[in-house]
Amino acid sequence: MDKLAYVHAQWDDEANVWVASSDDVPGLVTEAPTTEELITRLKVMIPELMALNSESPAGPVPFELLTRRFEMTA
């Protein structure tokens, strides 16, 4: 896969985790308490899911993590 995979993550305030999914990587849904942990999981899951979907990458898979979190002022 030479194209960039876009991964969207939104903060789940009730569960206190980032929830991520991607239209570019079928089956990708994961969560983690920090964006750093989320990135670590994505680096493993993206190539695994691509292989399961018969889209084995020739090398590293580039991805962009887009985060969204809503907050309120005090």
Task: Please give the residue ranges for each predicted region.
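Short aromatic-glycine-(Arg/Gly/Cys) micro-motifs in beta-strand/loop hairpins
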Residues: 10-23
